């Protein structure tokens, strides 16, 4: 059965908007996905959804260098660097609203449920802070706070934030100290782990991460992007081992659903990996290395059948895959 992608994008894969800064993508190749493309391997095939994530007025939503979140209703929240802040789409890809109020530039997004209410945590890398806000965009918490204290290596370069099953919060300093900090739900520091390097207990860029529930105990799956590898840690930040084969094509982000991890490799493709770390499908794999990992590809050179720079990724509730590119 073919599932949908969106590229924001949606791979139902749903389609998404390519929004390369400095280029007008209002028309022509690369403006939006215009053709449904089947991609992937047998048993793990997806089809792009043309027109998903395109506002009715056809305007470019702005430059993207961030992530997505998906709420329980299936609405998709896409982080932008500009005026829209967080652009919100329903599950059909229709633009519904913007969340502004200082929410631009979220490098990562993750949803949390507290009682009967949903919130989103964002890693706001340019402001050196983590922000928790409700689904209307009202900020309800900011970290670090007075309980956090001094973080080894500082708050600069926060690229990812996760919330564990027990409510602990994890900061990933992928553009900064290359360390991971574990905090209590109230913001108090519990543990600091890692640092710059290529060996055990080190990262060249702990750029993205996801909670992995496929094993007896929950794990953290870290995208060591520039180390071209992925690493499993315990929830207490203890090294378990490298996940899958190396070198990878610079894994930028990961989201796990059921038996599979969906990985955004910034060098031109999305992959699905099983519990053993085997790649079972590659989606919209771009053979043109000159288009990998860049936001500078001219609009007329972008095509419906290939990614350029997948950066953020999330599963949808019905098995969709949503992708934002560095663009």
Predicted segments, located by residue:
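Short loop/turn segments that connect beta-strands within beta-propeller blades
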Residues: 89-94, 134-138, 184-188, 234-238, ...
């Amino acid at each position: 059965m073919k599932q949908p992608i969106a590229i924001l994008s949606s791979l139902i894969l749903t389609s998404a908007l390519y929004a390369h800064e400095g280029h007008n993508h209002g028309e022509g190749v690369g403006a939006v996905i215009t053709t449904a493309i089947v991609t992937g391997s047998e048993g793990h095939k997806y089809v792009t959804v043309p027109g998903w994530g395109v506002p009715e007025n056809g305007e470019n939503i702005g430059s993207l260098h961030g992530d997505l979140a998906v709420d329980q209703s299936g609405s998709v929240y896409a982080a932008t660097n500009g005026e829209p802040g967080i652009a919100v789409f329903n599950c059909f890809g229709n633009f519904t609203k913007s969340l502004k109020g200082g929410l631009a530039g979220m490098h990562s997004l993750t949803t949390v449920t507290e009682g009967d209410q949903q919130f989103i945590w964002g890693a706001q890398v340019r402001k050196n802070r983590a922000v928790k806000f409700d689904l209307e965009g009202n900020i309800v918490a900011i970290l670090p706070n007075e309980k956090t204290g001094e973080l080894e290596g500082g708050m600069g370069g926060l690229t990812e934030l996760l919330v564990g099953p027990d409510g602990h919060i994890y900061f990933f300093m992928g553009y900064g100290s290359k360390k991971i900090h574990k905090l209590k739900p109230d913001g108090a520091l519990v543990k600091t782990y890692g640092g710059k390097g290529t060996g055990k207990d080190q990262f060249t860029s702990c750029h993205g991460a996801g909670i992995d529930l496929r094993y007896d105990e929950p794990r953290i799956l870290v995208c060591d992007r520039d180390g071209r590898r992925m690493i499993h840690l315990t929830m207490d930040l203890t090294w378990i081992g490298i996940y899958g084969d190396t070198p990878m094509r610079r894994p930028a982000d990961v989201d796990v659903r059921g038996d599979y991890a969906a990985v955004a490799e910034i060098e031109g493709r999305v992959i699905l990996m099983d519990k053993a770390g085997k790649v079972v499908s590659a989606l919209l794999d771009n053979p043109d290395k000159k288009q990998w990992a860049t936001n500078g590809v001219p609009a007329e050179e972008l095509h419906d059948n290939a990614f350029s720079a997948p950066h953020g990724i999330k599963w949808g509730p019905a098995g969709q895959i949503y992708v934002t590119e560095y663009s």
